């Protein structure tokens, strides 16, 4: 019974901490697009600027494929 109460209190405390942290960090992230592009290039295999690309198989790190080349 004591263990159950301790687990319940711990879960409630962790949930409250996450909610407080999420509320405090709202609107503080700057340069969102830059971060998402960086995250995309680090998490997937993509082609650099000037490399051949296909609009069907979206695979450029820069996010744009023009005239068959990443740009």
Curated annotation (Swiss-Prot):
Highest taxon of source: Eukaryota
A single GO molecular function term of this UniProt record: ion channel inhibitor activity
Residues modified to Cysteine amide: 70
InterPro entries reported in the protein's UniProt record: Conotoxin, Conotoxin_omega-typ_CS
Keyword terms, alphabetized: Amidation, Calcium channel impairing toxin, Disulfide bond, Hydroxylation, Ion channel impairing toxin, Knottin, Neurotoxin, Secreted, Signal, Toxin, Voltage-gated calcium channel impairing toxin
CC annotations in GO: extracellular region
Free-text tissue specificity from the UniProt record: Expressed by the venom duct.
Propeptide boundaries: 23-45
Cysteines paired by S-S bonds: 46-61, 53-65, 60-70
Additional remark text: Found in injectable (milked) (IV) venom.
Entry's family note: Belongs to the conotoxin M superfamily.
Summary of the function given for this chain in its UniProt record: Omega-conotoxins act at presynaptic membranes, they bind and block voltage-gated calcium channels (Cav).
Official protein name in the record: Omega-conotoxin-like CnVIIE
Originating species: Conus consors
């Amino acid at each position: 019974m004591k263990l159950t109460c301790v687990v319940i209190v711990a879960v409630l405390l962790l949930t409250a901490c996450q909610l407080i942290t999420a509320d405090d960090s709202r609107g503080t992230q700057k340069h969102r697009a830059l971060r998402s592009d960086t995250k995309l290039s680090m998490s997937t295999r993509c082609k650099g600027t000037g490399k051949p690309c296909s609009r069907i198989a979206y695979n450029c790190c820069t996010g744009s494929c023009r005239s068959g080349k990443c740009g």
